[in-house]
């Protein structure tokens, strides 16, 4: 299968000048390949570098060594650890999305504007972007009275749904999920898991961290286990089939 | 994407200077003084690009050279070395440090706009707010009084200056209003690049928030590039996708704003981030 992302001997070590030069190893020598359209689950105990790995791929962290090759449809690739910042901004705008458990709100910007901003960045007309967002608000179950309010005042579940909407609205080809269901109640968790299942059906490539092992097994095609900063083993789990899909969700 | 502006090895020395500090890579000292001759190294080896429509942040402590870099780009501070390539002149990509006086005025009045922390640097306090902005249109060769007035008033509405205050003198404006007039003045001739030198320094937090929102919405609507100088990394985080960190007149780190804040590499950047972010 065509690779979408290839991680080669990736290591991340934090050199903390503010702690007298202390070095903290997040992970070392991780290698794996994510084929196009597959879901790679990442598991491992807290502190074993799962989030750091995803942040290195998004270039929120600088990898210390190794390569992250991100392939396009023509088989060409770009090393995300070395690409110029301006290219990473373009990749984040057009090709790669990242959702963490923490919603990074933009102060004093309404829900509607938060959600359509990625489309405006890609040159969409405002009216078209609003139409697209309105479709998503229905799917994500965001009531109309919240559209023109500030998300900083919302509940955790509402914030997380808006976080995910903002990332999904411009149809990334690679999606990075860092515990998007953490600290959510059952209803919100179900909404988000159903959406991720639907994205899987559409063959979006996904790397996902889920704390709950059942969620992880349900969603993953492959699981990467991080153990003491090293991948212990790679195991195959059966592909999950969606039997009860009620969504008409087009990304 | 091709850069709008490319700054290469910019150097500004205050003082006599010597072969070392005037040379290509001056010896670093414990501060921004040349360890050999004692001249002030305001900036040296400063190299970066600005892309069309982006907001680039420059952070650093007082005296790190942030404002010097803006002054050099705005051609108000004479430099001691380096080049600044700009791509929007009719004659093609030019080193703007070597243009004639007329082109220099065109750059300052039409291609660039600047907003200072101190409104006395950016505004003429002996004419009205309206006059300040209209004057800039006059130097850009607009002559139709009604057209000038209409354009100024429209822009004042955009920057949310109350129409009752258009004709007041800058001394009678609040700090926030002075900054709004400066922003209007910077924008009036549809520049490619706006230089913002601590535009919200000294304002109270609610006014600061409104001015930052205005700058953010203008940069998104008009797709004008900006260089924003601030010592407040939270302000930079709100507006800029890329930042440069300066210390002792040199760039010590640069990168995506979230990367620099979440994974700072240099000792000073780590201290800066850990000092300002809860």
Please annotate each region the language model reported.
Chain B
Residues 236-238:
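A short, surface-exposed alpha-helical micro-motif characterized by mixed small hydrophobic
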Residues 169-173, 177:
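Conserved ABC ATPase signature
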């Amino acid at each position: 299968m065509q690779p979408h992302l290839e991680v080669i001997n990736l290591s991340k070590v934090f050199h903390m000048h503010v702690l007298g030069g202390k070095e903290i190893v997040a992970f070392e020598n991780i290698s794996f390949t994510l084929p196009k359209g597959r879901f790679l689950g990442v598991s491992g105990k807290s502190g074993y570098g799962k989030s750091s790995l995803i942040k290195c791929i998004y270039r929120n962290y600088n990898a210390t060594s190794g390569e992250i090759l991100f392939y396009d449809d023509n088989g060409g690739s770009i090393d995300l650890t070395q690409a110029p910042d301006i290219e990473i901004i373009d990749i984040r705008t057009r090709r790669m999305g990242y959702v963490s458990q923490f919603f990074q709100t933009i102060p004093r910007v309404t829900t509607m504007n938060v959600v359509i901003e990625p489309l405006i960045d890609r040159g969409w007309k405002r009216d078209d972007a609003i139409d697209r967002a309105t479709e998503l608000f229905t799917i994500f179950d965001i009531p109309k009275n919240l559209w023109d309010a500030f998300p900083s005042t919302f509940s955790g579940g509402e914030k997380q749904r808006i976080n995910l909407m903002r990332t999904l609205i411009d149809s990334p080809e690679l999606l990075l999920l860092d515990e998007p269901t953490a600290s959510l109640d059952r209803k919100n968790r179900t909404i988000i898991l159903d959406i991720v299942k639907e994205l899987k059906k559409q063959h979006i490539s996904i790397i996902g961290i889920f704390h709950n092992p059942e969620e992880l097994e349900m969603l993953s095609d492959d699981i990467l286990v991080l153990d003491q900063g090293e991948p212990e083993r790679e195991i195959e789990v059966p592909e999950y089939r969606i039997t009860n899909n009620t969504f008409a969700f087009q990304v | 994407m091709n850069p709008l502006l490319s700054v290469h090895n910019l150097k500004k020395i205050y003082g006599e200077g010597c072969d070392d500090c005037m040379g290509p890579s001056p010896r670093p000292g414990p501060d921004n003084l040349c360890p050999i001759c004692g001249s002030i190294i305001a900036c040296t080896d400063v190299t970066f690009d600005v892309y069309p429509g982006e907001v680039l942040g420059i952070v650093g402590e007082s005296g790190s050279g942030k404002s010097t870099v803006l002054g050099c780009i705005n051609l108000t501070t004479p430099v001691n070395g380096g080049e600044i390539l700009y791509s929007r002149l009719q004659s093609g990509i030019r080193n703007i440090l070597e243009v004639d006086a007329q082109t220099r005025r065109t750059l300052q009045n039409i291609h660039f706009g600047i907003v200072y922390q101190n409104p006395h640097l950016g505004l003429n306090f002996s004419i009205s707010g309206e006059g300040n902005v209209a004057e800039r249109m006059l130097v850009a060769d607009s002559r139709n009084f009604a057209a000038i007035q209409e354009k100024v008033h429209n822009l004042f509405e955009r920057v949310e200056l109350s129409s009752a205050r258009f004709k007041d003198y800058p001394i009678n404006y609040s700090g926030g209003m002075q900054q709004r007039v400066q922003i209007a003045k910077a924008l009036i001739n549809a520049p490619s690049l706006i230089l913002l030198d601590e535009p919200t320094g000294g304002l109270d937090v609610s006014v600061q928030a409104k001015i930052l929102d205005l700058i953010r919405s203008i940069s998104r609507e008009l797709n004008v590039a900006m260089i924003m100088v601030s010592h407040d990394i939270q302000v930079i985080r709100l507006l800029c996708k890329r930042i440069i960190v300066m210390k002792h007149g040199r760039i010590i780190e640069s990168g995506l704003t979230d990367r620099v804040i979440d994974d700072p590499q240099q000792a000073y950047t780590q201290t800066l981030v850990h000092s300002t972010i809860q």
